[in-house]
């Protein structure tokens, strides 16, 4: 792994408005998230219970980003939130932890994804011990 030699935070960067000859239609803000998944805008929502459920994931997907449905609910409800997004034929992510209790969640969501030919499973690598 290459060591990070410099890092910036939001406070380190300031964007100053300035006149430009470049038109918005000439700008490409897309990002290749995976080999087969390209987003129109480089925006992924946080997989937090106060941030992303179906409504937010729909709004972000319509804008060209990716909403990631949080995992702080039972598996059935998480799949219901995913279905809300998929009903509108949009892409969506689903957060799944890495702890032993999360394997069942991953299996159920993977089965749903494979059965319904869906897009993406988003993994959060967080162990169960981080919450205890």
Predicted features by range, described:
Residues 27-69:
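N-terminal cofactor/phosphate-binding cores enriched in small/glycine residues
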Residues 1-43:
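An N-cap/entry alpha-helix motif that binds or orients negatively charged groups
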Residues 20, 25, 30, 45-46, ...:
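Generic serine detector
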Residues 2-3, 7, 13, 51-132:
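Alpha/beta enzyme core
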């Amino acid at each position: 792994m290459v060591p990070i030699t410099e890092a910036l935070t939001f406070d380190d960067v300031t964007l100053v408005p300035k006149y430009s000859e470049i038109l918005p239609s000439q700008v490409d803000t897309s990002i290749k998230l995976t080999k087969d998944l390209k987003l129109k805008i480089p925006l992924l929502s946080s997989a937090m219970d106060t941030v992303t459920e179906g409504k937010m994931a729909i709004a972000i997907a319509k804008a060209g980003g990716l909403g990631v449905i949080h995992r702080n609910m039972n598996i059935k409800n998480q799949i219901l939130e995913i279905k809300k997004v998929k009903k509108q034929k949009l892409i969506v992510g689903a957060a799944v932890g890495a702890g032993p209790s999360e394997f069942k969640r991953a299996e159920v969501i993977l089965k749903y994804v494979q059965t319904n030919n869906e897009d993406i499973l988003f993994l959060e690598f967080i162990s169960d011990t981080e919450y205890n």
